[in-house]
């Protein structure tokens, strides 16, 4: 279990590139020889659709099914995990997870249901990436309790960066009260358009202020129409536009993430959650 790292990719704001990051970081890690499971923890099923499952609501078994088995203290159903052509596994989601989100409030140890669902899978993977829903609701709390670390995608604009403080406080609270091992791997700047002075100013400010206590990844994901097209084809940017700037950026991010893990194994660094 110790060899698997669970990363929650989260931001309570929608449209900041969480799902795109989950897909492309996951495929990037798989391309470097890592065993990767992607977990869709959003009832909208964006990650599931992005990996080519066009009708997720027709799936017989999904994340919600497995979580219900944990709640009922029953064995997990087989056949939930789907193998994608780009060598990543997917634990899909559908609209049933919306009911699970509401139902968790009446469950004992409700914050631990997702953790108990995926803990048995850790032995089969090097990385498990959880694509969180755009809220700070009970499913996101479950993801943060299940995770070892967090990656926070954020656009370089006023509204996105304004919401960071709330998210950071929530992560810190979960660390103090429930999951003491939780740490922040870093903030990932997405949909970056360096042609605008506003974006440049926000990035500079973010790196000089928040970056004093929390890593801001060196890699920046540029804005690209090609990246937005990937979900329609059910593939990663590495298949859709292998030689493009977004693929290069996600390849660089993959290296940063694996370097973080290598350094963590070699020495115990300071905890960066405040």
For the regions a language model picked out, list residue spans one by one.
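P-loop NTP-binding core
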Residues: 1-274
């Amino acid at each position: 279990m110790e060899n698997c790292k669970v990363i929650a990719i989260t931001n309570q704001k929608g449209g900041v590139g969480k799902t795109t990051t989950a897909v492309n970081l996951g495929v990037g890690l798989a391309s470097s020889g890592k065993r990767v499971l992607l977990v869709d923890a959003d009832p909208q099923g964006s990650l599931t659709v992005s990996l080519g499952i066009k009708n997720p609501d027709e799936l017989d078994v999904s994340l919600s099914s497995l979580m219900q088995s944990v709640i009922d203290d029953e064995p997990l159903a087989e056949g939930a995990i789907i193998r994608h052509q780009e060598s990543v596994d997917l634990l899909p989601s559908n609209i049933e997870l919306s009911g699970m989100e509401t139902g968790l409030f009446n469950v004992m140890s409700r914050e631990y249901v997702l953790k108990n669902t995926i803990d048995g899978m850790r032995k089969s993977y090097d990385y498990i990436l959880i694509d969180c829903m755009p809220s700070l609701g009970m499913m996101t709390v479950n993801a943060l309790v299940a995770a070892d670390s967090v990656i926070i995608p954020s656009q370089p604009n006023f509204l996105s960066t304004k919401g960071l403080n709330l998210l950071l406080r929530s992560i810190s609270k979960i660390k103090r009260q429930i999951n003491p091992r939780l740490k922040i791997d870093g903030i990932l700047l997405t949909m970056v358009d360096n042609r605008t002075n506003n974006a440049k100013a926000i990035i500079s400010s973010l790196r000089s202020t928040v970056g004093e206590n929390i890593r801001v990844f060196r890699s920046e994901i540029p804005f690209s129409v090609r990246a937005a097209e990937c979900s329609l084809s059910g593939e990663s940017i590495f298949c859709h536009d292998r030689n493009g700037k977004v693929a290069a950026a996600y390849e660089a991010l993959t290296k940063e993430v694996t370097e973080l893990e290598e350094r963590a194994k070699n020495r115990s660094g300071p905890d960066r959650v405040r």
